[in-house]
């Protein structure tokens, strides 16, 4: 596959240059100027910033309420700087300011001001995107010992420069991308030794291959296939952790149901345990005075297309609705949230003409593609500045322009088919034009339609077609005789 992340990084770096900085023009569909309706965005993370961007581009001046000292959410406070440099985020936020977005930082909705009070101030719509700010619980004895904390708390402390010093031996629990970030951050904060434990086996770890490789290159020990059973403590402080071997993580139905071998255990001495096994929403008093309903896991209930909650003027997006996902998912949700808010405050329909966002992943294991049929050029590799290893600076060396050209030339052009169901009239041309016979038409609700398939129609039409053909031929012969 093409190294799309590195190609995008190169393009983004060009966009950071002052002379090529892109600030979109506002598209204002009104003769008398911008929209005057006030919209409040609660949470300055990726979903909230995305929503603010698209609303501002459309002609609004939304207000973003952020409880921290600076906007950015998990992009700013949950991702280490050696992965995502803060000046990049700040540059993107500057674009929003240039578009007229107002930021009210240090204001926590639900504590400093409530949603009913904001309504009294004239706000007509609300977008709640506060993300998952709190770490879960380990659920084992001893987890209240000093030195045991959620990894996301460490990330927040380090990014806010409240803490950048650790010592001793650190155990990180969790094999996802956050676990990798926390482990590498702990090492950079001065930990003598960092070990990462997870339930999954080595090849099934949720973190990407690149994250795993970077952890190992930093000297982090990865122990796959282990589940914690107890935190060991001395005088109230963490002194170690006990694990047992994990045999399987999911059952036959694919549900999370780990099984263990109680006879195979391991006791690991350590001074700190950082767990990265999921996060949850901390609503506090945000929803006080509203009718917003919650799911059993604490996320908000909302329409899957419009993101509208049981409180009509409140919309949600990002992890607060979907649960833990990637930043790009939150950014996409923010765009759809902006569409819904625009329609809501303009008293328009929320549903007609919406992007249903159905994504069907390419089955890479079912490709009729012979390796000898294309130029199998090796993938471009990024360099690494070894002098920056184990520092908070990003040591990855971005692609040069020549590398970008070489990498994009590797694309096989499989393409992406975008289908808008709102515009499909069922003509069937796409099914006949597809060279790979990959498109087929199906009626979702046949009981609601009087349409008949072409095969069924031909059974009734064919006899009349033949009779008509015969009559036409006879008529032509009669004309010749009479002529």
Label for each model-derived stretch:
Residues 1-12, 70, 100-103, 406-446:
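Iron-sulfur cluster-binding cysteine motifs and their immediate structural context
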Residues 11-33, 91-111, 135-189, 294-310:
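Glycine-rich dinucleotide-binding loop and its adjacent helix/turn
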Residues 33-40, 90-140, 230-242, 247-250, ...:
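Feature captures the FAD/FMN-dependent oxidoreductase FAD-binding
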Residues 37-63, 179-187:
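N-terminal Rossmann-like FAD-binding beta1-loop-alpha1 element of flavoenzymes
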Residues 64, 68-99, 103, 158, ...:
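Rossmann-like dinucleotide-binding cores of NAD(P)H-dependent redox enzymes
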Residues 146-167, 231, 251-324:
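FAD-site-proximal beta/loop scaffold in flavoenzymes
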Residues 213, 219, 227-237, 249, ...:
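Mid-to-C-terminal Rossmann-like scaffold of FAD/NAD(P)H-dependent oxidoreductases
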Residues 317-345:
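A conserved FAD-binding loop/helix module that cradles the flavin
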